[in-house]
Amino acid sequence: MGIQGLAKLIADVAPSAIRENDIKSYFGRKVAIDASMSIYQFLIAVRQGGDVLQNEEGETTSHLMGMFYRTIRMMENGIKPVYVFDGKPPQLKSGELAKRSERRAEAEKQLQQAQAAGAETEVEKFTKRLVKVTKQHNDECKHLLSLMGIPYLDAPSEAEASCAALVKAGKVYAAATEDMDCLTFGSPVLMRHLTASEAKKLPIQEFHLSRILQELGLNQEQFVDLCILLGSDYCESIRGIGPKRAVDLIQKHKSIEEIVRRLDPNKYPVPENWLHKEAQQLFLEPEVLDPESVELKWSEPNEEELVRFMCGEKQFSEERIRSGVRRLSKSRQGSTQGRLDDFFKVTGSLSSAKRKEPEPKGAAKKKQRLGPAGKFKRGK
């Protein structure tokens, strides 16, 4: 889910923090991609007649087709992707995961009713609601990436948090995901729609955290409190407080604790056993991989092993897979050229002079808890 309504709120109150770019403008950029979010998109979008792609054994293959061709598209445009996979979800997320299970059970019932009624549109809608990324999907995509020569990382916990850590450490330019909580985890730059279908023709949206904080007049701790008020995966929000009201309250009172102290408890009851402090800590001190231990390497694809896996096991067209490998190899030759801004330091201009970012305080300054360095798999 991410943060409820955050993208629209930023567009309304801090529009200068959002840029829209064509994929070609990211030539030479390294980008950390939320793997689970991408795989979920592929399972939803890569379909034939409303159904996921399958081989003769009935195994789903939509995720592999999506991962193969979208990754090639990025490489052809000079982007160097590194996929980051989720680790163990934090305990705070258990409530949200339970709600998702309930929604899946309800969608299953509605799907059966739609099938009985022969309502094709409804059948497709509820079928997509039942899509879930499994360990097998993840493992197969990791195997595919290793054969393609594309690096991936296993995060100790939430992938978005480790993506944010890689951006903050300068290992990559941006984090790519549809989940806005990547900003709440502190990613300086967030890209949306990078792995979306070409058919949708969506421009890539680029969100800049420093500009968001400047426009709202908040520091990172206060921004985290705003996101908790909007609604996150980790704790309930206060009913009756909408996005604009949440912004007004945090700008005026500076913290959730002060807001709660001043709110009318009858009009705005605080959730029972509210875990907002735990959510604050999770956002400000997430368990992440150690960026300094990460060495990213993009290598030549293993054509014969790719054919064996994608064609022999998963029954894709050999001609198409070999064609894709040729495109991938060609893109590697072109992407060795760097960006001009990697060689020349920008000293500033009148139009883009940055104001000083509000200084974080307290817990925001504490070093993030580092999980295991993240099992790093290098493309062979």
Curated annotation (Swiss-Prot):
Renumbered residue ranges of the record's region Interaction with PCNA: 336-344
Region (I-domain): 122-253
Cofactor(s) needed by this chain: Mg(2+)
EC category: hydrolase
Residues engaged in binding Mg(2+) 1: D34, D86, E158, E160
Domain of life of the source: Eukaryota
Region: N-domain, residue numbers: 1-104
Residue list for modification Symmetric dimethylarginine: R19, R100, R104, R192
GO cellular component terms, semicolon-separated: mitochondrion; nucleolus; nucleoplasm; nucleus
EC number: 3.1.-.-
Cofactor: how bound: Binds 2 magnesium ions per subunit. They probably participate in the reaction catalyzed by the enzyme. May bind an additional third magnesium ion after substrate binding.
Residue sites binding Mg(2+) 2 per the record: D179, D181, D233
Quaternary structure note: Interacts with PCNA. Three molecules of FEN1 bind to one PCNA trimer with each molecule binding to one PCNA monomer. PCNA stimulates the nuclease activity without altering cleavage specificity. The C-terminal domain binds EP300; can bind simultaneously to both PCNA and EP300. Interacts with DDX11; this interaction is direct and increases flap endonuclease activity of FEN1. Interacts with WDR4; regulating its endonuclease activity. Interacts with POLB.
The protein, known as: Flap endonuclease 1
Organism name: Ovis aries
Encoding gene per record: FEN1
